[in-house]
Amino acid sequence: MNYDPTLLQRYAATLGDDAIESLAERELIRSVNTPAFDPIDADLLVDRVAGTVAGLTLGDALAARFRRSRTDDGMDLADVHRWLGGRRRGQGGHRLTAPSQTFVMSAEALLGDPSRAPRELATTIVRQHRSLRSPGNAIRYTLDALRQGAPWFEAAPPSYGNAALPRAVAVGLALHALPEQIGVAASLDAAVSHASPRATESAAALASIVAAIVTRPEDVPLADIVPRVVASIELPEVRDELEEMLAGNGMFAVPFS
């Protein structure tokens, strides 16, 4: 794993040696290359962070509406305009669901004390579980295990679903100024609910991409950033999936490795 061992020592000092040893033995602590840049204009950074949050939450709300649809026709621009236009009598709402809610939970924990954030996230999930809308199987499994007394670092199922990825966005935003910590922090966050190296490495990659995108200078194109992160992913199944997904996008026509 390409992370600094001293970083794990700092996490162990707050989360406990048993937690870090358990997660490391199962190869759940991951890291990838997060490009680092000189500080950019503060207003530009705020605008990018706000845009990222708006995009995530809007996508969650629209996706929730789409999941309730009985058709497979997808959404067009008219659908988006109608759903953004406000709730009318007889028209279904477009509320945020568990992915956005847990995004906020992770962000708040990270902005408090990043080294305690995974444990705080687990505590918050238990405390606020009744407010979660449409949580996935992994979150429900984790919640049951936590309520039965499992430690936060051993409560998650071996899932590699995508429900932890919105929280990875929170890591990338909250720790954008600490690129050397982002991968490990994102993998620890994901491990709270998804005890699979595939899930935690995916979270590390997404958090790194988000951090690089919001901090990049305006003269640095996305095509120079994303492939660098993807190429540093260690698990072939994660790296290959991302390469295949992005290869058809003209923005990422450069080699990934």
Q: What spans do the regions from the language model cover?
A:
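Structured, active/binding-site neighborhoods that engage oxygen-rich ligands
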Residues: 1-257
